[in-house]
């Protein structure tokens, strides 16, 4: 019986050790998916706000250190309030599509650092309602962003990912004749711009 237990323990240890030494990280030819899914609800006074976000991304390693990819996104944001028995609401639906390139340092290790350059195009529709009266407006825009990030592999296929936006340029223009675009440029470390996600490599 003891021999069986010892043999089982050795087999278990060997399996764990093999799993630990199994290749982790990224290599040329690897494909990965990542992204964000979230829902947030907040009430401030009489105003109730809901936000739903889904933004998947897929990338492919064209070399040992460079990955190219594409992403899509959808955000629904709604604010509701009641004033003088009239229900007011402000809803924004945003659709986005973009591409990105990443350069990885130490890509074939459990822990890696990368820099990402991304460009995105977005279309937003804003619907404002006051009782039975409704007004729609649309806007188009794009942005270019530079962000450093890190990956930590929990297993050969799953990793945690964090990115921090430090440089961002955006331009938004209402979808009406004669509209003027609003440009914005920002640089700096802002902890509010940290994005966390889960990566699946296959």
Predicted regions and their residues:
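Membrane-embedded beta-strand positions of outer-membrane beta-barrel proteins
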Residues: 33-35, 70, 99, 113-117, ...
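Residues that define the transmembrane beta-barrel architecture of outer-membrane proteins
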Residues: 29-31, 48-54, 91-97, 138-144, ...
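Outer-membrane beta-barrel translocator domains and adjoining extracellular loop/strand segments
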Residues: 44-52, 79-91, 124-136, 140, ...
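Predominantly the C-terminal beta-signal and adjacent terminal strand-loop region
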Residues: 77-82, 149, 154-202
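Structural signature of outer-membrane beta-barrel channels/translocons
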Residues: 59-61, 102-106, 122, 151-153, ...
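Short glycine/proline- and aromatic-enriched beta-strand/turn motifs that initiate or cap beta-hairpins
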Residues: 19-60, 64-71, 76, 125, ...
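Outer-membrane beta-barrel biogenesis signature
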Residues: 4-34, 103-105
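Repeated loop/turn-to-beta-strand initiation elements of outer-membrane beta-barrel proteins
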Residues: 65-68, 109-111, 152, 157-160
